[in-house]
């Protein structure tokens, strides 16, 4: 028997406040939906927006692309909500997001990308992380996709987006999620392999470049004399020892 979703208090966020202002087109989030019967080019933009939202990439990568789901969406065999679910439960999404983060950070990423808002508090992270432990990653994604919050804001035909990122009362909007929460956490970034230089031989003498003699330096003439390797045949001054 699985544990039900634990209670967590809500916090004040822009997306919880009703909007009465009228923003310019540049400030409003563009809504990609199939309710308007999009053309072929508009469908391409909708698919690109879905990949950008779920994978947080501005380009569709070959590794993340799901051509079968794209074909089903183009021929109206599945809804946008099912397409979003297919992207979120794909192996590429799991490898790029779940395998390189802990459960708490994975919850934060999924809530931002699927529900279009930030997590309310640490208690919400704990509550959803318990769902991951009980139902697995696919069960957790299904809980978000089938939640009342998702259906009320996006329904079956709208691509999720960051809700109320800009409001009329503020000069600057909130930071986009792809900049606020990058793919890799601090724990994983510290484990990344850093490039190392492997020297084949031992370094006997090293002089920094700024300390190397330049043209006209007497040291260069002294080295030239050493390179001549002149050995005198006799010693005019027997009292002196040859070097």
Swiss-Prot record:
Topological type in the membrane:
Peripheral membrane protein
Q: Which GO terms describe its biological process?
A: photosynthesis
Which ranges carry the PBS-linker domain?
Answer: 11-191
Gene3D superfamilies for this protein? Phycobilisome linker domain
Subcellular localization(s) per the UniProt record: Plastid, Chloroplast thylakoid membrane
Coiled-coil blocks: none
Q: Which InterPro entries match?
A: PBS_linker_dom, PBS_linker_sf
UniProt keyword annotations, A-Z: Antenna complex, Chloroplast, Membrane, Photosynthesis, Phycobilisome, Plastid, Thylakoid
Pfam families listed in its UniProt record: PBS_linker_poly
The GO cellular component terms are: chloroplast thylakoid membrane; phycobilisome
Q: Does the keyword Plastid apply?
A: yes
Function, in words: Rod-core linker protein required for attachment of phycocyanin to allophycocyanin in cores of phycobilisomes.
Query: Belongs to which family?
Result: Belongs to the phycobilisome linker protein family.
Q: What else is known?
A: Although originally identified as Cyanidium caldarium, these sequences derive from Galdieria sulphuraria.
Q: How does it assemble?
A: The phycobilisome is a hemidiscoidal structure that is composed of two distinct substructures: a core complex and a number of rods radiating from the core.
Q: What is this protein called?
A: Phycobilisome rod-core linker polypeptide cpcG
**In which organism is this protein found?**
Galdieria sulphuraria (Red alga)
What lineage does the source organism belong to? Answer: Eukaryota, Rhodophyta, Bangiophyceae, Galdieriales, Galdieriaceae
Q: Which gene encodes it?
A: cpcG
